[in-house]
């Protein structure tokens, strides 16, 4: 707003018409995976493949990043991602939120916000999509989230405070990708985030090319339980992010300096851990652990796979079995048997060769 904030950014304006994607990182200055991914995206995306415009802001909260101040504003101690849409006459973070929501977001047709766990948080990679907006915006946000190579996605149920939440309330399909944490970053995490962004751009037709490979198709996680510590203490988690949990299971404990038990974290229902505090200390009313319920909806991909095989053969089962028992499969079966440990009593369940792929289903004891 009025030139108060100078943000490192790149604008890729293609020669062909199309939509505009806004990509931001560094809303929290200590979340480095997204920042490095944004930097590399600005260098590696080819402008001749862009249809429309891609705006990449590499660091939003520059003062906090440059002073290693974590998630909080340098002068006001506020969390920028709780201040949207902001206030032009407010504190530093309120003014920055106002500048982003009134200068950057209105230019966008779609929005991706890149995050990590805080410098004290461990997490399993997942994605939020905006859930408090009109039906079309929510649907488009979800389709964007479905392109992300993470195991889980969460529908957000707030419409303001966060940058992507507010953007969606203004009709801009928006998601927030979580990957990495603990004030660190790796090249693999950065590559994965770059790949996610590129796949979304290809899906939307803003970037020309084929979508890259992926490992996951995210499952919905609902009813998120954010457990905060009731008092300061030493935190001893018994689980890791991504672990499955059962109702009534003890997830961790808070103790004092003498080892006295202050508090237990107990699972309220079956689910999966999304993130937890990774440092020894926890603060009263501060985050301890977050988990949610995994939803297993009908998966139409199974039908698509069956349909594919049915088109290849009038008799699906006969055709499939012929491929599974091809001469090449038999040769591989002999080679694999040589590698199995003799003392484990393992047996191979199946081995198969298909068009363009080779699959092995093994090893069961007994």
PLM region spans:
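Secondary-structure boundary motif
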Residues: 43-47, 338, 342, 364
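Conserved SAM-binding loop of SAM-dependent methyltransferases across substrates and taxa
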Residues: 355-365
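Structured catalytic-domain cores with a bias toward divalent-metal coordination
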Residues: 1-300
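Residue-level signal for well-ordered alpha-helical scaffold segments within enzymatic catalytic domains
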Residues: 40, 199, 335-338, 361
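Conserved class I S-adenosyl-L-methionine
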Residues: 298-341, 345-352
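Short acidic capping loops at alpha-helix termini that bridge into adjacent secondary structure
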Residues: 52, 344-345
